[in-house]
Amino acid sequence: VTHVVPLVRTLQRAWPQLPLHWVIDKGGQKLLEGLDGVVFHAYDKRSGMGGMRALRKELPTESFDVLLQMQVAFRANVLSGFIPARRRIGYDRSRSKDLHGLFVNERIPDRPGIHVLDAIGSFCEPLGLKQAEVVWDLPVPDAAREWAGAQWQDDGAPVLMISPCSSHARRNWYPDRYAAVADHAAGKGWRIVLCGGRSDLERSTTDAIVAAMQHPALDLVGKDTLKQLPALLERADLVMTPDSGPMHIANAMGTKVLGLHAASNPARSGPYSDVRYCVDKYDAAARKFLGKSARELKWGSKIEFDDVMDLIGVEDAVAAFERYRSDRG
C-alpha cells in the first residue's frame, strides 16, 4: 500500500479539495490510518461476495467520477464491479490478467521495465497529471515515535535493524546468515535490532538468529503495532530485509535498505529511492532456475523456487553493508 501513497499525494497537490475514497485491506488501513483527505473502506477478502455487497452499501450512493483499479487479481476485479464509476482506469494490456480488461474502460500507458511504484504513479496520467515527485509523508502519530524512542538509548551507535521475513517463504534468507552479518556489524560498533510481526515463522526465525549470534541483539519482534512500525524503522540507520512490506515502509520513512533479492528484481520491486545497498542475485536465479538471463524474462517475473535465496552468501550482504558504511563515513 505504500506505493499508492505518492499517487494520493500527487492527486492532492493538483486538487486539494478532491474527495478520495480508498478500498483497502484491514492491515493497510491500520498502517495508513490518519492519512489526510482519504476515506478508507476496509474489505476483507475472506468475506467473499457478502463483503462486496456490504462494501457497496457503505460507499456513497452517487457514482464516482473516476475509479483507479490498481489491482488485477480476479477477486479485486470482481470487487471493482460493485463500485459505480464513469471512468474506470486500469492497467495496460501487458500487466493485465484475470479478465481485468472487462472491468475497465481506460488504461494507463504501457511502459515496460519500470518500478511498481512508477506504474502505480502513472494512473494519474489519464487525468492529465504527471507524478513528477514522489512524496510519502506517512501518518506517524507522536505516540508511535515516543514508543520507538523508548526502545533503546540513543548513544550514538549506528543501528542495523533486521526484519527477516517476507510474506513469501521462498524470499526469506537463512537465520545463520543473518546472524553472521549481524555479528560483523556488531563488531564494527553497530547496535543490532530485530523487528517483525507475531507469526510463528517470524518468532522461530528470530529465535534462531539470536541463538546463532555471538553478540547481543535487541529483540523487538512481535512487540510493535502497525502504527509503531514506521517510527521504529525510522530510527534505524540501515534495514536488512528480503523483498517485504518493511522494506518499502523503511524506504518511505527515509531509511536506507540492505535488500536481499534473488526471487524478485530490485529494479522493479526493491526500495524505490535507493538500491545501492541491495544484494541483487535475480539474474543468477534466472539463469540457474529458468535457464535464461533476467533480460529474457517477462518484466515482473518471480523466481520463487526452493533454495533460490541460497544464491545470496554472507559475503554478499557484508559487502553491501560495507558499501553503506563507507558512504556513511
Predicted regions mapped to residue ranges:
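Catalytic machinery of carbohydrate-active enzymes
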Residues: 1-329
